[in-house]
C-alpha cells in the first residue's frame, strides 16, 4: 500500500477489499511510524502517524494525519538544519513565482526537527516517478519525455533548479501525475528541495550529456522562449 499510487496486493482468495485498507481513510499504527522517524522504541505518546517506506531517499520519513489532512514529515540530517531551511525557502520562492510545488514548513515531532508538507496525491490523482515512467512511455530520452508529457512545468523545473542550486533532481525526484483512469495529466508539482543552494557553476546536468546545469537552463530559455518566465 502507498499514498502515492493506487496499487495494492492481497493474498489469493482473501476477502479483503480496498476500502478495508484504504490509507486515505484508515488509521495507522502510531508506534511503527514513530520508530521509523526517531529510530527509537522508547515512545511516550501515540499519534496518528505512519512510516513512509515507499519513497526513495535516505532521509527518515513518516506520515501524520492532522485535522483530516495527511502530511509527510522528513527528518533533518543536518545539525544546523540547513536542509529544512532550504526546503522552506525554495517553497516560499516558488509560491511567489506561482510555480506548482509542494509547500514545506519547519516542524518538530517527538523531539525530531523535520520539514513538513501536505501530500498532493489523492484517491483519484497519483504520481509515478520519471524513472519508472520511462518503461511506460517507451521514451529513452528523459528530456524529450519531460517535454512531451509535462512541457511547461518540466522546463520551469530545469530553470528553477539551476537558479536555486538544487543538485538532487535525479530521476526519482520528479514525477508525473496520472488519474484513476491511468491517463497522464502532466508533471507533478515540484518537490524535494533539501539539496537546494548546493550547486556549482560547472556542475554537469542530468538532462544534457556533457552540458552544465547553466548551459541546459540557457538552452531551455532560448529554445522554448521562456524569457517571460524570468
Kindly label every feature range from the protein language model.
Residues 172:
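Short, charged phosphate-coordinating catalytic segments
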Amino acid at each position: 500500500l502507498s499514498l502515492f499510487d493506487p496499487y495494492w496486493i492481497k493474498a489469493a482468495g482473501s476477502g479483503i477489499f480496498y476500502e478495508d485498507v484504504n490509507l486515505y481513510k484508515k488509521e495507522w499504527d502510531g508506534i511503527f511510524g514513530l520508530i521509523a522517524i526517531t529510530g527509537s522504541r522508547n515512545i511516550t505518546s501515540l499519534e496518528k502517524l505512519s512510516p513512509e517506506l515507499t519513497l526513495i531517499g535516505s532521509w527518515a520519513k513518516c506520515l501524520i494525519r492532522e485535522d483530516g489532512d495527511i502530511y509527510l514529515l522528513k527528518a533533518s540530517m543536518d545539525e544546523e538544519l540547513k536542509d529544512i531551511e532550504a526546503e522552506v525557502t525554495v517553497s516560499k520562492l516558488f509560491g511567489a513565482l506561482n510555480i506548482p510545488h509542494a509547500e514545506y514548513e519547519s516542524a518538530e515531532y517527538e523531539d525530531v526537527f523535520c520539514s513538513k508538507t501536505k501530500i498532493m496525491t489523492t484517491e483519484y490523482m497519483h504520481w509515478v516517478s520519471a524513472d519508472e515512467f520511462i518503461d511506460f512511455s517507451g521514451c529513452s530520452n528523459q528530456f524529450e519525455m519531460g517535454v512531451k508529457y509535462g512541457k511547461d512545468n518540466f522546463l520551469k523545473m530545469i530553470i528553477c533548479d539551476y537558479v536555486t542550486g538544487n543538485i538532487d533532481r535525479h530521476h526519482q525526484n520528479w514525477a508525473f501525475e496520472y488519474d484513476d483512469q491511468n491517463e497522464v495529466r502532466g508533471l507533478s508539482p515540484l518537490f524535494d528541495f533539501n539539496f537546494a543552494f548546493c550547486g556549482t557553476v560547472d556542475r554537469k546536468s542530468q538532462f544534457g550529456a556533457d552540458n552544465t546545469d547553466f548551459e541546459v537552463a540557457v538552452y531551455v530559455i532560448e529554445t522554448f522562449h521562456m524569457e517571460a518566465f524570468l
